[in-house]
């Protein structure tokens, strides 16, 4: 509505309507709820202009503040005032945006604080507990703190039965106390921590961390390392060996003789070399790239080829005698 509606006379011929006296009379830039018993919500300016033109010389307006008090006002508008009726639709939109603006601004701030509080325990592995002092205190005992021997982490020692700490359902014995009412417990003595709790008021806010969450990943890594250094069976026999301390069996090649004659030590002791040659041939067969057993003749074949009778003992004696001659 325009401010001309509040004047007693208008130069363009409009006259003041009935019922404008008193506190219930409409004011300029006032939110309008209904126009001729029709709600104005979600109506465009063209629709409002059409309603004003169809209303004739009398409009019945109901402002928004009068809904609760069931109050209304009658205003007579001449045809010359019809172009000014378009202000009715523009003013409530501007006023509504102004009134709802301050209400919507604090909401993102509150949501950011709530989301940060919910993300804090997940991101750092910590959790917070707020306790209210009961008749017997907060119902928990502490252990640790800085002393003469060293700095022991401050932790929850025990929970009083049916106390506030036990009823909250989050605390356990052994939880590390990191903060007391927003203050870090690093470097605190046991007496100082107890004094902070006593003088902190009826509410106690603790930030804690469970030891299993800190050492869980470390224990898994150590356990996996032991499994890697476990002993494995030797493929050459029932003997066990460690993978880090021993060399692969491929590098352990047995030393075998390729010559046809026995060593001087075997001749001196009188041992027959035939029994030692067969395992040597078997080992040479297993190693790829080594010469076959046909290149290393046995003593029987060699003695038969040379026409020597008496077997390997006589052959060994003759070969030893030949070496002495040379």
Swiss-Prot record:
Lineage: Eukaryota, Metazoa, Chordata, Craniata, Vertebrata
Source taxon at top rank: Eukaryota
Keyword terms, alphabetized: Phosphoprotein
SUPFAM superfamilies reported for this sequence: PDZ domain-like
Region (Disordered): 1-32, 214-267
Phosphoserine: residues carrying this PTM: 263
Annotated Pfam families: PDZ
The keyword Phosphoprotein belongs to this UniProt entry's keyword annotation: yes
Annotated signal sequence range: none
Protein name as annotated: PDZ domain-containing protein MAGIX
Residue ranges of every copy of the PDZ domain listed in the record: 128-212
Bias (Basic and acidic residues) ranges: 218-242
């Amino acid at each position: 509505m325009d401010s001309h509606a509040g004047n007693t006379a208008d130069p363009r011929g409009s006259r003041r309507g009935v019922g404008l006296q008193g506190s219930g009379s409409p004011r300029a830039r006032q939110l309008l709820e209904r126009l001729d018993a029709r709600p104005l919500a979600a109506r465009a300016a063209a629709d409002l202009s059409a309603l004003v033109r169809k209303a004739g010389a009398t409009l019945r307006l109901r402002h928004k503040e009068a809904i609760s008090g069931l109050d209304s006002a009658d205003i007579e508008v001449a045809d010359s005032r019809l172009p000014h009726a378009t202000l009715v639709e523009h003013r409530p939109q501007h006023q509504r945006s102004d009134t709802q603006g301050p209400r919507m601004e604090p909401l993102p701030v509150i949501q950011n604080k709530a989301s940060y509080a919910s993300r804090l325990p997940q991101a750092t592995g910590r959790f917070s507990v707020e306790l209210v002092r009961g008749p017997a205190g907060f119902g928990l005992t502490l252990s640790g703190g800085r002393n003469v021997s060293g700095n022991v982490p401050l932790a929850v020692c025990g929970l009083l039965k049916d106390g506030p700490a036990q009823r909250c359902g989050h605390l356990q014995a052994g939880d590390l106390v990191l903060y007391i009412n927003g203050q870090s417990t690093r470097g605190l003595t046991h007496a100082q921590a107890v004094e902070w709790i006593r003088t902190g008021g009826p509410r106690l806010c603790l930030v804690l961390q469970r030891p299993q969450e800190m050492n869980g990943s470390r224990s898994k890594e150590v356990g996996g390392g032991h499994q890697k250094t476990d002993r494995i069976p030797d493929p050459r026999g029932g003997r066990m060996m460690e993978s880090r301390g021993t060399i692969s069996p491929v590098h352990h090649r047995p030393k075998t003789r390729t010559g046809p004659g026995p060593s001087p030590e075997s001749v001196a002791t009188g041992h027959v070399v035939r029994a030692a040659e067969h395992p040597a041939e078997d080992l040479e067969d297993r190693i790829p790239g080594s010469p076959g057993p046909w290149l290393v003749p046995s003593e029987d074949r060699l003695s038969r080829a040379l026409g020597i009778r008496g077997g390997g003992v006589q052959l060994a004696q003759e070969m030893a005698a030949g070496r002495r001659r040379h």
